[in-house]
């Protein structure tokens, strides 16, 4: 048990050193902390008095941190960084347990060291709140592999209430635990999130509906579909003050989709279903490779992409793929996303989006192919 806490302790120590040594503005950097603070500064509570583009857990957490900080931005930023540091430390702990389950001692250490290096050096982990959703995802994954469907369902349900992406582990649960337990995991996960959204809808139907509508209404960004639609922009919404008006959630200045999203969903959904039915998985590592395929297909279909979403890929890449492949593909896709944001787009160089999107999409395809080879009997 104690050995699993060594890497988390190193991460916490290194993060605290950064927090003590750097100006707070340097830590906040090119992330979304200003956006989070301004949203929390709005009067009232998310989903009740204003709409939010995020699922409810983080907006409520942000509001709580704002109130604990007495509205002081520096205190808000510091507390949020500490919360994200705890989440990253727990992610390392869970990754360590997963690695020990899959590999011999020395290889598990190498892969854990790679993940520690990513979390310690990649600013996305403290610029955005995705580390909290990754925590729910890894916890759900561990409990799926341990065949604990109820616990896995609760973890994934909480993850869905942070970011939608952990729902993608439900097919993995069915593959690992069979239809009865896997469907139970899915029912609990979706039921928990539906229960929370239902309660919010009863409290404020207008702003809950606006919150749910906001992401689907904003159009495409930073993907091949966005290039096709002529949307050379990021996924940001308008000024925070607009969230006090539920009608603004459905407004967008982006071009509509040239190819309707439901059409591309049929194509990629069909690929996903064929993969689910055809691939035979036997080992836990192959199960994680199957999950990597699922994530890859989903994000190849997705109308939008944000560079920090690479955080959802790093654990399965390091757990599923051969170590040389994991290092090469993982390192390259990290660099490609950093080049996109913050290096180029923060400087207004949106004309480079066709290049960065093309590189990332190619890497995503290679990732899916590598994961498919891992499941279907490729190199371990």
Q: Whereabouts are the PLM-identified features?
A:
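Compositionally biased, intrinsically disordered low-complexity regions
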Residues: 11, 221, 237-240
């Amino acid at each position: 048990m104690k050995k699993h806490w060594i890497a988390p302790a190193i991460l916490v120590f290194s993060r605290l050193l950064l927090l003590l040594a750097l100006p707070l503005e340097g830590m906040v950097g090119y992330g979304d902390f200003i956006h989070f603070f301004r949203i929390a500064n709005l009067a009232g509570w998310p989903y009740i008095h204003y709409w939010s583009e995020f699922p409810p857990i983080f907006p409520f957490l942000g509001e709580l941190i704002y109130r604990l900080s007495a509205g002081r931005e520096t205190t808000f930023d510091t507390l949020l960084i500490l919360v994200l540091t705890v989440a990253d430390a727990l992610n390392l702990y869970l990754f360590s347990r997963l690695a020990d389950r899959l590999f011999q001692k020395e290889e598990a250490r190498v892969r854990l060291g790679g993940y520690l290096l990513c979390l310690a050096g990649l600013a996305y982990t403290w610029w955005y709140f995705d580390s909290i959703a990754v925590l729910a995802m890894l916890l759900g994954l561990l409990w799926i592999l341990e065949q604990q469907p109820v616990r896995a369902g609760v973890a994934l349900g909480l993850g869905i209430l942070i970011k939608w992406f952990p729902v993608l582990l439900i097919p993995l649960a069915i593959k690992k635990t069979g239809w009865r337990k896997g469907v139970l995991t899915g029912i609990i996960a979706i039921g928990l999130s539906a229960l929370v959204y239902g309660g919010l809808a009863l409290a404020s139907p207008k702003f809950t509906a606006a919150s749910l509508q906001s992401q689907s209404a904003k159009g495409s960004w930073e993907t091949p579909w966005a290039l096709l639609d002529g949307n050379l922009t990021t996924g940001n919404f308008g000024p925070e003050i607009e969230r006090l008006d539920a009608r603004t959630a459905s407004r967008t200045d982006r071009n509509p989709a040239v190819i309707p999203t439901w059409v591309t969903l049929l194509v990629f959904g069909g690929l996903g279903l064929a993969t689910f039915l055809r691939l035979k998985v036997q080992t836990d590592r192959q199960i994680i490779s199957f999950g990597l395929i699922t994530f890859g297909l989903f994000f190849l279909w997705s109308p939008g992409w944000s560079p920090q979403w690479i955080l959802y890929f790093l654990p399965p890449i390091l757990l599923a793929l051969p170590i040389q492949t994991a290092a090469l593909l993982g390192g390259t896709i990290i660099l490609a996303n950093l080049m996109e944001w913050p290096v180029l787009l923060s400087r207004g160089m949106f004309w480079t989006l066709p290049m960065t999107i093309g590189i990332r999409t190619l890497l995503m395809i290679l990732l899916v192919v590598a994961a498919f080879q891992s499941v279907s009997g490729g190199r371990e």
